[in-house]
Amino acid sequence: MLLASFAMFAAMPVSAEDDGEKVDRTPKLHGTIRGKYEYQTEEGEGRFQVRNARVSLDGKLTKIVSYKAEIDLSDEGKIKMLDAYTRLRPVRGLDFTIGQMRVPFTIDAHRSPHMQYFANRSFIAKQVGNVRDVGATLGYSFNVGFPIKLEAGMFNGSGLTDQKDFWTSNINFSAKAQFFLPRGFNITLSTQKIKPDNVSVMMYDAGAYYHAHGWHVEAEYLYKHYGNNAFDAVHSVDAFVSYDIPLRKCLFTKISPLVRYDYMSDHSDGMRYLDGKEDTAGQLVINDYQRSRLTGGVTFSLDLPFVSDIRLNYEKYFYRDGAIAKPSERDKIVVEFMTRF
């Protein structure tokens, strides 16, 4: 019923005059479906999974006011509300956003599922720097010979928790600067403060990429510090290379061989645990053990890139001595079909 309602609403064309300028009020319906098969080579076990079934609705009410609402009907089998915000753009280059959103932080963690290069996200994007929250941001884009985009915001700092009775006296923020340099180069710097429990967590991220002539080369480093020395600082790295090979008169429009290295030290999610359960009488524990990973693979594009892709990856994990690997964080072969509409 929800999908049917979205589709009916999106199919209704509406327009309005705004200061003499015609505004298309027709809502735009988008979606991303990712179905995959994974086989863990050491355990000899496999599984099918719907990783995402996202549906979003966005549009404009006036030339100043826009909106977006996005849900995931199957985020590893769970329904989640992802984005729900209103955006105001009073003048060119300046925008104000309020609601629930992905915070402006990092490069890889800010990618939507259809924009990912690999079937499974990097450690930065999945464990260390993946934060959605409720708050407000201010963004400003300008040009100094090359484009610059600045974003900063204040948030609850607790993630997507029960918002009804959540109150805080903490200032939780995120800030990000992107420099779109000539010849396909980009430098991105960002920082974020959160407080998921009783300990403040500061994160600092620096990354750069080159995107031109079929190449995408990217490297990113994230440093995560816990207040009151509650947990050792976390270091995380993500680096990868992808090259597009266009094809003609073929089922695929291009193929893209790619390789990635990522690493993370022992990581805590910032919550206190006692006897394996969240408990305010406990302390911060290791939720993700130190590991590195090599990922190699090929992406087959059936249409435009990031519209209909088949991602074939192999992941090789390297854990530190004494580490405990989670059931789904082991050597595996992954075949994923991604469709964006």
Q: Where do the model's predicted regions map?
A:
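Intrinsic disorder/low-structure terminal segments
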Residues: 5-8, 47, 154, 239, ...
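Outer membrane beta-barrel
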Residues: 19-159, 169-173, 177-186, 240-242, ...
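Compositionally biased regions
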Residues: 6-7, 16, 175, 187-189
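Active-site cleft segment of glycoside hydrolase catalytic domains centered on the general acid/base Glu
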Residues: 163-167
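N-terminal periplasmic/intermembrane-space "pro-region" immediately following the signal or transit peptide
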Residues: 2-34, 341
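Outer-membrane beta-barrel pore domains
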Residues: 41-43, 62, 87-89, 109-111, ...
